[in-house]
Amino acid sequence: MNIFSHANLGTTEERGDDAKRTILAGTDIVGDILKTTLGPKGMLKMLKGQHVNVTNDGAFILNNLMIDSPSARILIGSSTGQDWEEGDGTTSVAILASLLVKEAGKLEMHPTKILRGYRMAQAKCEEILSSISFEATKEDLLKLVRTTLCSKVLRYDLERFCEICVNAVEKLEGRNDLNLIQIIKCSGKLEDSYLDDGFLLKKDIRIDDVVNPRVLIANTSMDQDKIKVFGAKINVNSVGELEEMEKAEKIKIKGKVERISQNGVNVFVNRQLVYDYPLQLLRMKGIQAIEHADFDGVERLNNVLGGKILSTFDNMDESCYGTCESIRNVHVGNERMIKFSGVRSGASTIVLCGSSKEMLDEAERSVHDALCVLAKIKEDPRVIYGGGSSEMAMAVGLNKYAMEVPGAESDAILAFSSALQQIPKILADNGGYNGESIKASLRAEHNSGRTSYGVNVRNGSIGCMKEAGVVDSLRIKHRVVTAASETAQMIIKCDAIVKCKPRERTRE
């Protein structure tokens, strides 16, 4: 089918230089927006929409942008993928990809040769990263979290939050299920934040303390009058018939309570409301009911207590019940919550205190990034030095590698190297220093073999990142380079932009 036929008058196409300019403009927009947020001295962005958000989280910024450019949307998708896979490095992916596309635009050669050179450069970068990596110690884990959080809002109380994040992950005892770590937000001062053992359920209800409880978690209706609840209508001939219906409903709900109370259950957590009559029956059985718990809380509670979320109570066995050491009321800030202590799997709760909703939301995103980095380092414990040292090490290695490669591909490898060298320059620029001068000095140090040297944003100089304690995860850095390179190659290979006519909608 010819999409440019007279039947598709709404279809438009850009080719040649016009298409390349449009594609480059889209990637430049994303790169320019994000590059000022990179590093410890990165700036914040104020996002205005339904709510105002202040953040420097790359994935959050990109997901809230309204951009029509197709090349920009590809970068956003790549950054979002980085967030899903690794939890950190989202800003670096988008910036590096935009720089690679920009450097490729300066080369006057066929895109196929550029792509071949970029693939060769990508493979060489993977070799260089592996050669400069080393196994992380427990001290390196703290350094890794510091590097992650130093560019976030939590940098003002860095040591406290580093300790909170490391302890929370260590409690998992080798498991990488971050769903076992809950984050609760409340009003207060940031320095009042802490790590609490156990699980906190956000439910303002008073309960008696229970030791070694037997918990049944459910998502089931606990009302005996569905006619009133659903607004249905029935026709009866007498009040007696209505009374018989009421009795039948009560008998039904009583049977449900009997099934709930079997096998020694003393705490019942329900996703839905528990009405007065079943609540009375549960109390008579010595069962404490927690009703209308939020869905996310019920899912997490089921994970940490064990058992199952039930909707019916037939054929129950031991696997249906959860347990912990104790349940009691606690106050977090100005809110009353229910604490489940001594839960399995090393679950814990991070309580974040802040003066505003915007501060709490940004703190939550920062803690999530740090937890993701720590979880991934358990899978691959290798780390590298940060501060732009790894990017410059790859760039210098590519410069030497390009001298060995014949043909036009060497120019593409040098372009890849040039893009990598922009990362330490951006780090220095964001600190208010002379980025070009620092980049040149850092390149000279790496040419002399000092591969651990990077940008010291505290004093605007270059220094040893080993002494400064700045480390990055090898796994995350490897994926940043891979994702940015593959995204850039996809964009470079495009030679036209086709905008199709929207499908016509008709009433049938």
Curated annotation (Swiss-Prot):
Record bears the keyword Mitochondrion: no
Subcellular locations according to the entry: Cytoplasm
Gene Ontology terms: cellular component: chaperonin-containing T-complex
KW Nucleotide-binding (keyword) present: yes
Main subcellular localisation: cytoplasm
UniProt KW keywords: ATP-binding, Chaperone, Cytoplasm, Nucleotide-binding
PROSITE patterns tied to this protein: TCP1_1 (PS00750)
GO terms for MF: ATP binding; ATP hydrolysis activity; ATP-dependent protein folding chaperone; unfolded protein binding
Subunit and partners: Component of the T-complex protein 1 (TCP1) complex.
Job description of the protein: Molecular chaperone; assists the folding of proteins upon ATP hydrolysis.
Family label: Belongs to the TCP-1 chaperonin family.
Entry-linked NCBIfam families: chap_CCT_beta (TIGR02341)
Protein name as it appears in the record: T-complex protein 1 subunit beta
Higher taxonomy: Eukaryota, Fungi, Fungi incertae sedis, Microsporidia, Unikaryonidae
Gene responsible for this protein: CCT2
